[in-house]
């Protein structure tokens, strides 16, 4: 069977039946060759650079960086120039947007350009309510104004002349026909549907209609 060994596992054997031991230590693993018994061809000589560094025990001093070339400077400063160009373009766009906001949105509706301008407080999202409109139910608006995706028309008696009119003219005409024009349209029962529809208009047109609803300007509107 062979000699017993303190090493784990079966003992490797050569073809001639002898144990293949490379180290005489009893606890050394099989095929373990210490550096003292290894051939000289297996041992690589240490790198002279690393050997000198290990002997010195001091890091190599860093070299001073050379100034960047013109191409590197252009690459560094190019994004800043591009950002400045974009900022100029954004300022032009903002100027055009503010000028558009100050332009009259519905001139000729009540024959007053100043009343149809959009001001900054109106763009803040605050609700714009007509006088005596607080406390009214939302169903008053939902009954008279169908959803945008419903194309059915409730009033089938409209003539081609009424279809050709613009929305502000229809609203003003309904305001003239509304009994008791000084009262809010949603509170009057005999008021046509177009009068209640006026509260779903944009803020600029809503203010124009509000001015038209006043008894003093109802005659000239």
UniProtKB/Swiss-Prot annotation:
From which domain of life does this come? Eukaryota
List, alphabetically, the InterPro entries matched: DUF5545 (IPR041422)
Listed Basic and acidic residues bias regions = 13-23, 155-168
Source organism:
Homo sapiens (Human)
Feature: compositional bias, Basic residues = 1-11
What is the protein name for this chain? Putative uncharacterized protein LINC02693
Q: Which parts of this chain are annotated as the region Disordered?
A: 1-23, 139-169
Membrane-traversing stretches: none
């Amino acid at each position: 069977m062979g000699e017993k060994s303190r090493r784990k596992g079966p003992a490797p054997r050569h073809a001639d039946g002898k144990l293949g031991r490379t180290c005489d230590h009893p606890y050394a693993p099989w095929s373990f060759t210490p550096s003292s018994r290894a051939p000289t061809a297996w041992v690589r000589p240490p790198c002279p650079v690393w050997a000198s560094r290990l002997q010195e025990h001091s890091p190599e001093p860093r070299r001073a960086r050379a100034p960047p070339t013109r191409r590197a400077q252009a690459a560094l400063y190019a994004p800043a120039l591009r950002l400045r160009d974009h900022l100029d373009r954004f300022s032009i766009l903002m100027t055009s947007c503010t000028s558009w906001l100050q332009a009259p949105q519905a001139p000729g509706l009540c024959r007053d350009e100043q009343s149809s301008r959009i001001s900054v407080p109106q763009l803040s999202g605050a609700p714009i309510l007509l006088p005596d409109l607080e406390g009214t139910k939302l169903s008053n608006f939902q009954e008279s104004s169908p959803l945008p995706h419903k194309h059915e028309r409730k009033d089938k008696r409209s003539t081609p002349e009424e279809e050709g009119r613009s929305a502000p003219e229809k609203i003003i005409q309904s305001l003239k026909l509304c009994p008791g024009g000084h009262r809010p349209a949603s509170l009057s029962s005999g008021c046509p549907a177009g009068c209640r529809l006026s509260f779903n208009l944009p803020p600029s047109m809503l203010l124009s209609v509000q001015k038209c609803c006043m008894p003093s300007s109802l005659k000239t509107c």
